[in-house]
């Protein structure tokens, strides 16, 4: 108790205006209320007596007025009496014209100059009303460069976490056009134009040509090749199925090579997918560059079970383009023919093959307005499942709506149609002619135009005769040796080719134009000693009509379901065909 009295005395000395703390009173068992109040009031003279009795009956001696009671219960506060104006936030606007815009866009009335909205405080649940006001120029008040945000009385009930920025309020609630911020931002960018900017590095994608864009609207093909970056390995342009990178491609073996490039079997390491990589050497000639881009474009846009699937392409710094495509493990038809029994394709295989080629040609022309222009055994591949696919669109030409015919002179001469040789306009029917010639070669095992029909020629001229030279190739395929071939190999080495030289090509072209079309009708198979299939001969004759106006289109030939193509779509020959394809696959291994 002594310690408490000492502390109270020290506190009292700090406040000189207060009287000293009186000593505690010893209260009896029944203390007097008046004495108790006197001790609690510290003996102050200005203390107003209060009654401790809670009963409604008041004593006559200690009665208080109602005004005194109210003053005690609700003490006055200077904060409540103070009349301070609401805070005004000055906000810059776009211009004087922007501030003088009528506010009818906000409230729906031309005389309205403020917006009221309610905001609920998540903590206390109190609804706080706020006012957004703008000085109106319609009432004669000159418009200033500021708008005012008026918050009623005080903002102490607003949750700070729920406060929205002024720009957002003006933009979302009052829909004001804050063009000043865009103006200041543009001014800042103009004034800081010397700051360094990061430019995104442009990558050239060779094959990502949108199929929806017309070729007329796109730029020319030649400048695209010339603008290719001279990097060591440009990124591979891929489809959506695979993400290719040149470092992820592992070469397994070489499949073949030609004048324009080579083909090899590769492995995509991340997916363990086997692919075929075609390397094309870029020539400085714009014609070669156009052919490369055309092949990439066609491969990228074609999606058909009868067309080889395209995975992507890349450009190397050694003037080569790498194309990754689907790998067909059985190879091309010219490699499959020597593996067949009797070096001839069975009739059921020829039916499946013809259906696949005509379906692929129909898809190319009807969907992309494309003619292949180079149908031959080298450009038809087969998988181990017996699926036939068209490839090598290097000399194909994409036709536009205004150009339905092509007038160029390219392709393999042996499979060219008469209208192409004569320099006439040709279309998709030219591929039908090439298909018929290829079927004769696969069915008989002997290349077309190889038989020497001019038996009256002298033997001394057989070395210079193109027919005899072609017959030497036929003898080679049958396992025989030809003296003319041995002499030619001594002169030209392994690069011996039939109809080599201007005279040979001229003889071949003259035969295609002047002689009757080749046929298997009424001919005997030299191996089986039996006539060829009747429907096969009829189908080949329809393909080899010399008058292209009478010759049928691929889709017209596919309509014949009762003769040559009977049972093909129904899968009558599927089991036998797959068994044959497996045998070919085993022979390839």
Curated annotation (Swiss-Prot):
Name the positions where ATP binds: 255-263, 278
The entry's family comment says: Belongs to the protein kinase superfamily. STE Ser/Thr protein kinase family. MAP kinase kinase subfamily.
- Tell me which domain of life the UniProt entry assigns to the organism this sequence originates from: Eukaryota
Short name of one Pfam family:
Pkinase
Query: Biased composition, Basic residues: where in the chain?
Result: 185-203
Coding gene? HST7
Q: What is its EC number?
A: 2.7.12.2
Reactions performed catalytically: L-seryl-[protein] + ATP = O-phospho-L-seryl-[protein] + ADP + H(+); L-threonyl-[protein] + ATP = O-phospho-L-threonyl-[protein] + ADP + H(+); L-tyrosyl-[protein] + ATP = O-phospho-L-tyrosyl-[protein] + ADP + H(+)
Q: Where is the composition biased (Low complexity)?
A: 24-33, 92-121, 206-220
Task: Extract the ranges annotated as region (Disordered).
Answer: 1-162, 185-233, 473-499
What sort of enzyme, by top EC class, is this? transferase
Residue positions, PTM Phosphoserine: 402
Read off the InterPro entries from this record.
Byr1-like_cat, Kinase-like_dom_sf, MAP_kinase_kinase, Prot_kinase_dom, Protein_kinase_ATP_BS, Ser/Thr_kinase_AS
Biased composition range(s): Basic and acidic residues: 1-18
- Keyword terms: ATP-binding, Kinase, Nucleotide-binding, Phosphoprotein, Serine/threonine-protein kinase, Transferase
List Phosphothreonine occurrences by residue.
408
Residue ranges the record marks as coiled coil = none
List the molecular function annotations (GO) for this entry. Answer: ATP binding; MAP kinase kinase activity; protein serine kinase activity; protein serine/threonine kinase activity; protein tyrosine kinase activity
Task: State where composition is biased (Polar residues).
Answer: 57-69, 127-136, 144-162, 221-233
Domain Protein kinase, residue spans: 249-565
Name assigned to this protein: Serine/threonine-protein kinase STE7 homolog
- According to its UniProt record, which residues of this chain constitute the active site? 374
